[in-house]
Amino acid sequence: MINKKLKSKSVLITAGAQGIGAAITKHFIDSGANVIIHYFSSEKAANELKNYAIEKGQKAIALKADLTKESQVNLLIEKAIEAFGGINILINNVGSLIARNSLDKMEENFWKKVMDVNLTSMMLVTRAATPFLVQNKNSSIVNLASLAGRKGGHAGSLAYATSKGAVLTFTRALSTELGEKGVRVNAVAPGLILGTAFHNTHTTKASAQKTIDGIPIQRAGNANDVARAVVYLASEYDGFITGATLDINGGVYNM
């Protein structure tokens, strides 16, 4: 999907070099945007996407950071502003199940780690980027939530589902707070998205097939399904949509 209204806009995508994040980054590049590609461990993929954008005549940088560390977040934003002069769009894509743990096996450190990766990092990046987002007209934020945040997730995803439910609330609350400053805030909640490290690591083939059998359109999603929705919400042509969550799950959850 090519969105000409994104041409020359500056977009920061966290975890923008693998899985859903890589698809999001590529869709923004193909729409003419300049991209700030954050990564933690996917340096090679990040640089490949950076070079892809540069070859198309656009600006791009790849920056490494641990987004659970405030100092590294602040440095990331500082480098982005130095390179691009501003940020128009923020995509908060960082997130992980980390491991499956039920309540009776839940350790405090594990719980805190999941919350730090999925929620605290989002707050830190958004807080650091917002002073620059508000300087540009029609800026927007898109947060990556999950169907697990809607329904509670599969067995062992208590901490993950809780954190993603909090992302939904964070999105609604922040849309109210930043609306008067001209920044829209929305989220997407993907369901089963195969071909990603998340499901390759944490979902068995049998579990995936069982889930697919319950999806009305009878297929799993893919990273491009999510990327198209993110680009839509981030763009200027839907300027009256804020505080919303777009469910991408083939009809499993349709409220």
Residue ranges of each PLM-predicted region?
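Substrate-binding pocket helix/loop in short-chain dehydrogenase/reductase
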Residues: 101-103, 107-115, 199, 211
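Alpha-helical segment proximal to the catalytic Tyr-Lys
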Residues: 131, 176-177, 239
